[in-house]
């Protein structure tokens, strides 16, 4: 990037209802997703020769909440470097000064699909356990830095056709050391842990509940706790898992406890009935063993009382998962979060704006000095060409046939379905 920005470095293109003003190195923009946090386009990076995802943060300075989320996401993405966490490749703004500053663009790896597009596939145990292993590795890496994701759901987990998986979207991630009372509307309702629903606060294994919900959804092909609202979500949980013990009730605030204790009592359904043998792969005796292990893992993750729920470390060592265990992945050095006050910070919008601007300028300065001129090892295959289109919106070619890819063979056919090969 040149020492001073010029209009010639950027060009504008209309994407849905938004205008993307991006560096000219990013061509062939195509919208692939949108949400409260921003709009995402697939693009081809003519400098690195790879397909990337360009995310434009939606009105990051419209209020303090949006501004804080934007700052948090940017800081965390800059700090985290793990093969199961999405990699940040570039950050830029087309504006030249703090006074003009209003747009933030994040450039990240482009994957083939998110888990929403995988839910209805018939996954064998090998692929399912490997996807879960990677999910847990990514979560453990975040937890090792005191970061709780808080918003794990199928749309925030992306995969490639070689069965690699990455976690994305850190707008809601929060450091664990912060003293706070949780708002119940942190996580998408279906994946929200009981302690969040009941306003108990949380610890790291709040993310394990979400993983359990996602695993259950992968097994059954549908959302397992599909509440219509906040209260109904709790009802759906206890209808299946049973009314919690008196010991758990004592941990609740009096008003919440009064409500919970006055709900109809449910004995709960056995996990053998919630997740019967026939919904798992059962082609061999080995599959039957794996089915028993998978169900056992679900029963340990989907526990209402967080004090009795399995931890990330325990999940990684569970028989269903541990076959994949690699210390380099599961015990990677924790990321160093350079802003120790990441959560305690409270600022006016203009102050948040200045902090974010400094982060963007810091990235651009480091890029000029060659610190960030290449993607990390986790980036997508550099063999992509402009003519290769990501299959992120076309998963019709997904294969459920068991084909193993070499650990070292990262080359991908762009027409291949997201889970065509698993290591």
Curated annotation (Swiss-Prot):
GO terms for molecular function: ATP binding; JUN kinase activity; mitogen-activated protein kinase kinase kinase binding; protein kinase activity; protein serine kinase activity; protein serine/threonine kinase activity; protein serine/threonine/tyrosine kinase activity. Residues 26-321 form the Protein kinase domain. Serine/threonine-protein kinase involved in various processes such as cell proliferation, differentiation, migration, transformation and programmed cell death. Extracellular stimuli such as pro-inflammatory cytokines or physical stress stimulate the stress-activated protein kinase/c-Jun N-terminal kinase (SAP/JNK) signaling pathway. In this cascade, two dual specificity kinases MAP2K4/MKK4 and MAP2K7/MKK7 phosphorylate and activate MAPK9/JNK2. PROSITE patterns: MAPK, PROTEIN_KINASE_DOM, PROTEIN_KINASE_ST. Its EC number is 2.7.11.24. ATP binds at residues 32-40, 55. Residues 366-423 are annotated as: Disordered. The gene is Mapk9. Residues 387-416 have a biased composition (Low complexity). This is Mitogen-activated protein kinase 9. Keywords: ATP-binding, Biological rhythms, Cytoplasm, Kinase, Nucleotide-binding, Nucleus, Phosphoprotein, Serine/threonine-protein kinase, Transferase. Coiled coil: none annotated. Belongs to the protein kinase superfamily. CMGC Ser/Thr protein kinase family. MAP kinase subfamily. It comes from Rattus norvegicus (Rat). SUPFAM superfamilies: Protein kinase-like (PK-like). Interacts with MECOM. Binds to at least four scaffolding proteins, MAPK8IP1/JIP-1, MAPK8IP2/JIP-2, MAPK8IP3/JIP-3/JSAP1 and SPAG9/MAPK8IP4/JIP-4. These proteins also bind other components of the JNK signaling pathway. Interacts with NFATC4. Interacts with ATF7; the interaction does not phosphorylate ATF7 but acts as a docking site for ATF7-associated partners such as JUN. Interacts with BCL10. Interacts with CTNNB1 and GSK3B. Interacts with DCLK2. Interacts with MAPKBP1. Interacts with POU5F1; phosphorylates POU5F1 at 'Ser-347'. Its main location: cytoplasm. Residues 366-375 have a biased composition (Basic and acidic residues). Its cofactor is Mg(2+). It is an enzyme of class 2 (transferase). The modification Phosphotyrosine is found at residue 185. The keyword tRNA-binding does not apply. InterPro entries: Kinase-like_dom_sf, MAP_kinase, MAP_kinase_CS, MAPK_JNK, Prot_kinase_dom, Ser/Thr_kinase_AS. The TXY motif contains the threonine and tyrosine residues whose phosphorylation activates the MAP kinases.
